[in-house]
């Protein structure tokens, strides 16, 4: 099944996804306004019926051709939680390269390693790419969990809660093409890092 949550984007996404509205294996959820990535993913979770859940953004920074290799370890019962890593062994460090905004790219690359170190130290793991969009897991991993984050801090909440439940992810290399802010990247360079720090402090110690 494919569950599409479209938040009334201004980039033409709605017109594209509406073409699949009548497909028998597609569930289309149309929102009246953008409420953030976390809100959209939580809406999708509520509609999902499959045993394996995979999160995919519509901008296609990540290749759809990696689906099989991400799902296979879970489908074969080897692991419960998989991260599609841009920086795992075999893929190198996929530096964000915004030709038109090199300063923004440099800031995001530095921030990635800084925040990755914080989450690794705080949670007792060693992950090269904890903030990857590709998070794939068996639905049992989130059974009984309540999620509340609406923006990109949802990635922190999901990762931290699954690790605290004992589901330590494996990382599998994936292909990645960075999208610049002029191409529609939505991260708020100053606001979002503050929400990430709050999410780390909150969800690392909050009762599950």
Give the location of each predicted region.
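Residue-level signature of catalytic and energy-coupling elements of molecular machines
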Residues: 44, 59, 118, 138, ...
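Acceptor/aglycone-binding surface of glycosyltransferases and processive sugar-polymer synthases
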Residues: 25, 31-47, 52, 64-152, ...
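Conserved short acidic donor-positioning loop in nucleotide-sugar-dependent glycosyltransferases
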Residues: 7-8, 21, 35
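A conserved acidic beta->alpha catalytic loop
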Residues: 6-15, 60
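Short beta-strand/loop segment that forms part of the nucleotide-sugar
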Residues: 1-9, 29-31
